């Protein structure tokens, strides 16, 4: 019984995962206690022989496991050929005439003037500045900024409104706002800091419409996910495509489920939903599939599930948005609920 207890799979795993080899002194003390309880010399000889058989091999097995196998248990089935790196600032600007410009370091400091608006491009931000000395055409001229997988980019509109676009997102907007309202079209996710000009600012996002005067909010409107508007400060009006409309207060979030025209409102910690703008990615009790949708857009990677049930396992974690994905993978492995294999830019989950 003593041998089985010491060498059981659970006991060895316990010592190996804690980074320690088997404690021979503790094992010997346990043997001695049993010896003292027995007055039978033959039984003592038998126990001593068991002890010798147990302690000597286990001592060396423990040392061997500590220095040669501990990494295996720590990483279990993690296979990483090369690290999957985080995204970076990159985008494509499409002008009204169809011309496209890659927004990266090579196009930094490029300066153009379109319909009386100066466009300043640097490595992370696209800045539209209305040239006061130039007349603006009454007909709106539109530009579009598209963010690929593994990208993000910041944008300052001609009215001073700041927009931070997330991966796989796009914003279509007028170079200069010429009518009584400011209106843009969003797909994906963006964080808005709307300047106060007295004119309504309207965001059309896949059937959801958000109207404000001057405020800070986050919109997530990816085509395969529910639509969310999270209000940081100010006031916004949220409207479903063919349904109700309502006014949000600060710290409230409006959600429209896919295929629905009803709006659900709840109070939230807004920093949780806007942390991506500040270099963090937070998850709280979320399905693995939903977590990986977010991460795959940012890390530009493919995700495979060998067992469909793994998609519904729930996790929570806080990540540095600008680190490679390895720390996250190790966190998943420690739960022992899922194992991970990484090959190229594909991450595979299995039992």
Where are these regions (language model features)?
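N-terminal amphipathic alpha-helical interaction or autoinhibitory segments
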Residues: 1-8
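Generic detector of short, aliphatic-rich beta-strand segments that form the cores of beta-sheets
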Residues: 3, 28-35, 254, 347-349
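Prokaryotic Sec-type signal peptides and long signal-anchor helices
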Residues: 7, 19-22, 26, 63-64, ...
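Short helix/strand-capping connector loops at secondary-structure junctions
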Residues: 8-16, 309-316
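Positively biased amphipathic helices and basic secretion/translocation or surface-docking motifs
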Residues: 12-46
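A residue-level detector for the "anchor" residue at the start of short, highly conserved motifs
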Residues: 39-50, 60-351
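Extended, solvent-exposed functional surface patches
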Residues: 56-58
């Amino acid at each position: 019984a003593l041998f089985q207890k010491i060498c059981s799979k659970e006991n060895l795993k316990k010592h190996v995962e804690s980074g320690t080899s088997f404690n021979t002194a503790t094992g010997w003390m346990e043997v001695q206690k049993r010896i003292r309880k027995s007055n039978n010399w033959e039984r003592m000889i038998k126990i001593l022989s068991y002890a010798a058989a147990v302690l000597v091999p286990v001592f060396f097995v423990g040392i061997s496991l500590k220095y040669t196998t501990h990494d295996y248990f720590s990483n279990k089935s993690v296979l990483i050929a090369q690290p999957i790196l985080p995204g970076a600032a990159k985008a494509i600007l499409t002008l009204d005439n169809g011309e496209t410009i890659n927004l990266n370091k090579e196009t930094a400091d490029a300066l153009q003037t379109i319909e009386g608006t100066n466009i300043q491009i640097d490595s992370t931000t696209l800045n539209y500045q209305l040239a006061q000395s130039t007349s603006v055409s009454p007909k709106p001229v539109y530009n579009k900024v598209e963010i690929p997988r593994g990208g993000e980019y910041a944008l300052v509109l001609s009215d001073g409104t700041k927009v931070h676009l997330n991966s796989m997102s796009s914003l279509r907007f007028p170079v200069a706002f010429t009518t009584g309202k400011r209106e843009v079209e969003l797909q994906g996710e963006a964080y808005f800091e709307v300047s106060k000009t007295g004119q309504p600012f309207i965001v059309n996002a896949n059937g959801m419409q958000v109207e404000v005067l001057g405020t800070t909010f986050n919109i997530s409107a990816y085509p395969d996910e529910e639509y969310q508007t999270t209000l940081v400060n100010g006031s916004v009006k949220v409207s479903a495509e063919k349904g109700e409309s309502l006014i949000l207060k600060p710290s409230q979030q409006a959600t429209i489920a896919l295929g629905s025209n009803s709006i659900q409102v709840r109070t939230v910690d807004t920093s949780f939903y806007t942390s991506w703008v500040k270099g963090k990615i937070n998850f709280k009790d979320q399905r693995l599939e939903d977590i990986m949708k977010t991460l795959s857009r940012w890390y530009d990677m493919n995700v495979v599930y060998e067992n469909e049930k793994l998609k519904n396992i729930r996790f929570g974690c806080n990540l540095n948005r600008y680190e490679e994905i390895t720390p996250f993978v190790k966190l998943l492995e420690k739960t022992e609920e899922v194992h991970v294999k990484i090959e190229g830019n594909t991450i595979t989950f299995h039992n």
